[in-house]
């Protein structure tokens, strides 16, 4: 197992067996979670029954003795839906959020990048740079936008006789990157297929760029000496452009202050930024988008930052990074809503702060961070509603968290379709609680004369229940659809003025069909792909970036993976949470009665349903999957960890606190140790090798 040499392919026989086991366990867990939410007590052994279950026909329902007692207890003693936030809670949230913000924004990306450029209009069009005098052993850097063609480079001493033309590879996948003229690589047929060799050392006074065709969008070109210093361009001229359409070649050298010492992730796009951040740029300029395989909202957020700060690495990563920062208070509030203890809310926030996946995935300009935050918040508001009751609070007050949950559900789905997975979890939680409220009304009708609270519940369910269901149609159907459609406004603006008509709706619908067909028919292979059952164990981290030109003896890399202390502990914790649900409800013969922890049991199924809704659908996905698809499950395994330690605290306080301290120290220490892998910080290869714990684990 530790060699990680097994089950790399997601379609192995054992993978199917594990999938079947997972589905069976999940079905049983979902059943027991629903029973918990609906107010069921653990079943009792036959010999312990004093008498058969009592039933009643009043109200058209029948309740067991245990369910009657639960209904009576909550009608007389409603749940506490408040978080009980105090000054120290805000202080802890603020401190953790501030600390994480500093780490997240440090070396996030350059705040300067070329903003203007030169677009070729014809094949054979040339631009000549005059460096003023003959230069030796210099390199050529270039930065481009969205381009369709390539160009070649040649140098000359006198401006008349040029040397061999060298291809400067530059295509759609190389947009918004600083690139260096490098030695070409060749395919099996001897055809140049890329450039991954060392930088080419150039000599001469004149540098000529010759474009292969129209549409090559270069935003800046620079000659750089061996020490990384920019060599000033004394003059520049262009020829061969289509008459009347020639661009100003000075746009190629007008932002030389943006030229970096060397290309790195800090000044260039990497991994899927070439799709998502590029689409943000296209939205900002009302262009037709290249990437249409996911809903647009996350890319719209990026476009807003690009509008405000320009097309720079810092700008296109800002929205995702801010989202990662907001996850810290979000999980703190979610933990307080569920557990209502500062200690465990602080632990939850700290573990998320120290998680490597959270750090890496929110600093890259992809869309995955947005739905995760929105899913956390939509579960937060649903949990709040579940702790309320329209028997005890005014109806409109109970509808507020439902409305908020629906809004964030819409935002999650409009960011990425994984929000639909979470929506299923919300539905399970909502209807389970709604049925519980119905059961309470059944009990109240039979005992309405015993207490005014029973009379209110007996008379109130029909009207308030119907109003709640009607409101939920608006909150969880109409509102999300409206949000989803509104998120397409920037996409539609590329076609002209956006109007509400059948053509607009048809375009939105066709975009959904295109998305669905893409994911349904996707057939691809990838060395770093991994099946769902490997993610919790961090079997195969996902490689995002390696520096092309690191210093001698050093390396810079970015990998997506979890903090072992957080994920491996979280795996044990979520198994405990799922297993404990079964233990409390389906295995009574093993249960030793020691009293009941109501707050624990009410929080437990919410965590279980949240985790299963984020994770379980991936068991059924046959397409290529990666470890970052586990990201949405991470908040729930962290909450499970806090719940598990809290459960232990009730039985052995000293042991619980000792394990908590060990976990905190381990999580922080491992985050620091793995920080170079998570951040791209250039460090010695020796350190990276030391942290490469298993065979074929990390990449640098």
Where do the model's predicted regions map?
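Transmembrane helical bundles and short interhelical boundary loops of multi-pass, membrane-embedded
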Residues: 2-37, 41-49, 53, 57-92, ...
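Aromatic-rich transmembrane-lumenal/periplasmic boundary elements in polytopic membrane proteins
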Residues: 229-280, 461, 481-538, 685-692
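Membrane-interface transmembrane helices that cradle and orient dolichyl/undecaprenyl
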Residues: 378-401, 412, 431-441
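Transmembrane-helix motifs of polytopic, lipid-linked glycan transferases
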Residues: 314, 318-339, 377-381, 580
